[in-house]
Amino acid sequence: MELAYMAKLPKEEFEERRTRVFAQMQPNSALLLFSEIEKRRNNDCTYPFRQDSYFWYLTGFNEPNAALLLLKTEQVEKAIIFLRPRDPLLETWNGRRLGVERAPQQLNVNEAYSIEEFATVLPKILKNLTALYHVPEIHTWGDTLVSESAVNFSEILDWRPMLSEMRLIKSPNEIRLMQQAGQITALGHIKAMQTTRPNRFEYEIESDILHEFNRHCARFPSYNSIVAGGSNACILHYTENDRPLNDGDLVLIDAGCEFAMYAGDITRTFPVNGKFSQPQREIYELVLKAQKRAIELLVPGNSIKQANDEVIRIKTQGLVDLGILKGDVDTLIEQQAYRQFYMHGLGHWLGLDVHDVGSYGQDKQRILEIGMVITVEPGIYISEDADVPEQYKGIGVRIEDNLLMTEYGNKILTAAVPKEIADIENLMNF
């Protein structure tokens, strides 16, 4: 699969986004965004650079120590970028820089300045403006620059609601990239099913997944991978990934690639030895039933809450049927008795961040719209010390897919990974 050539958005899309921001800004105002900086790992080594998602959304610029200023007056709307100047010596050591001279043409902005000039240039640009869209304390290095520039405004506004709502509805180009992120993530999970066997270590399976991501132009995961064998699956964010996989256990894998800045996010649970035991099958089928029903309900015009309420009812009834919960289903739901086995939400927005931005509405009652992308990930987690029948102790199951809201309902972007028991067992024993 050759995907590298497809891994970019056209620069006109970033310009169009900025135009939409200008339309929402107050007259005589400016909006200020800062990039990420390189993060120190230890001594003189840094982590691989990953751009701030908001900054990327409006610029498509992947260098640290930069700032974007959107200026709106009665006469003009300008996009101004501050960035590192060219430096032949540092570029020889650490990589190429775009530089001030090339930035306007490459980024489709009106003006460019060295970030070293920020404190002196900013007051001149912002003179006579009445409002500044700026969020302090996200990037403290940027706060320092703003402080040094000594600019004062009668009104400081938060740009996050505006940009978060924009990011929530994906463009056709974003959907194309997210489909590819889902496809590559699916390949990683399929590889994991094919290579898992008793006595391998969790980290070996993680390495198989990451290798598959890398083979398909996704160099980094979108979050820390979870490979949780046995009762480790009952730890929601288990990332140690250092235990052997035991014959007779399940393994829960929650892993996603990042492709062209966009996240994939899949969870699958399957038997280490390729064959579900009867108790494992019973819990798995209950989670799968809940997920399938949620997928039916997660369509434009409905809310996440509608789907989650149905998932809770299905799970509670199923847990009663298995003797794990005891009592009247309606009463158990009212008491939230299910929460000892299902303690997280049904899903989350997906995009530039794996837990992407955008309001869910009160009690997750926001109505889904075409262009939104959401995960659907019900689970059941029964700890080893739970007061339940012995055969269910230590079983943790989660099944997660990525859904795109469409005019026809939804599209599962991650459907390539098997989740029916027969399909999983056939793949693992092929």
Swiss-Prot record:
* Source organism (scientific name): Haemophilus influenzae (strain ATCC 51907 / DSM 11121 / KW20 / Rd)
The UniProt record gives the binding positions of Mn(2+) 2 as D254, D265, E400
**Record-linked PANTHER family:** XAA-PRO AMINOPEPTIDASE 3
GO function terms (MF aspect): aminopeptidase activity; manganese ion binding; metalloaminopeptidase activity
- Gene name for this UniProt entry: pepP
Quote the CDD domains the UniProt record gives: Prolidase
| Protein name (record) | Xaa-Pro aminopeptidase
Cofactor binding comment, as recorded = Binds 2 manganese ions per subunit.
**Which Pfam families did the record assign?**
AMP_N, Peptidase_M24
Going by the entry's taxonomy, the superkingdom of the source organism is recorded as: Bacteria
Cofactor(s) in the UniProt record:
Mn(2+)
Record-listed Mn(2+) 1 binding positions: D265, H348, E377, E400
Which cysteine pairs make disulfide bonds? none
Task: Give me the Gene Ontology terms describing cellular component.
Answer: cytosol
Q: What Gene3D superfamilies does its record include? A: Creatinase/methionine aminopeptidase superfamily, Creatinase/prolidase N-terminal domain
Q: Which InterPro entries match?
A: Aminopep_P_N, Creatin/AminoP/Spt16_N, Creatinase/aminopeptidase-like, Pept_M24, Peptidase_M24B_aminopep-P_CS, X-Pro_dipept-like
- Keyword rRNA processing among UniProt keywords: no
EC number(s) from the headed UniProt entry? 3.4.11.9
Report the family membership: Belongs to the peptidase M24B family.
Listed under subunit, the entry gives: Homotetramer.
